[in-house]
Amino acid sequence: KFTTAHGKLNLPAEYGLSWMLPKIVGLGRANDLLLTSRVFTSDEALTLGFVNQIFEPAELVAQTVAYAHQLITSVSPNSLRQTRWQIYKDLHRDVASAVIESERLIEDMAMEEDFKEGIAALVEKRPPDWPSIK
């Protein structure tokens, strides 16, 4: 279960929740959750996009490890790092600035060994062996 209980305690939406929640679930849904301070279930959290998946407690660690394994074996570490940076940076930019920056990054990253390995792995239909983690 989840809640934004601040309203029931005479507190404001704390720790940036009023900034973050609308970006995750949309303005209307964020208003509902923040203004009512109601409890919502994991199923509703999934529907809202607040969480990506739901697992039984006994499965949580194994599923988390499987997800991490998928990331580190299929996605370039450089791409992960750069994309994560872009996601958070682009929250504060307009789309034109984001596109310009992505074009610059493409030029830079296309010169890296991980790019060459990614292309080779795709063509050869095999898992990549990222040079950046050797």
Name each region found by the language model:
Residues K1-L34, Q63, Y67-A68:
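CoA-thioester-processing core
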Residues L21, A45, T83, L122:
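Terminal peptide-recognition signature
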Residues L33-L34, L71, Q86-D90, L105-A110:
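Helix-loop "lid/cap" segments that line or gate small-molecule binding pockets
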Residues R38-E44:
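Acidic, divalent-metal-coordinating active-site segment for phosphoryl/phosphodiester hydrolysis
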Residues L48-G49, K125:
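Structural motif
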Residues V51-I100, D129-K134:
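C-terminal long alpha-helix characteristic of the crotonase
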Residues G118-K134:
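Short, basic/aromatic-enriched C-terminal tail that caps enzymatic domains
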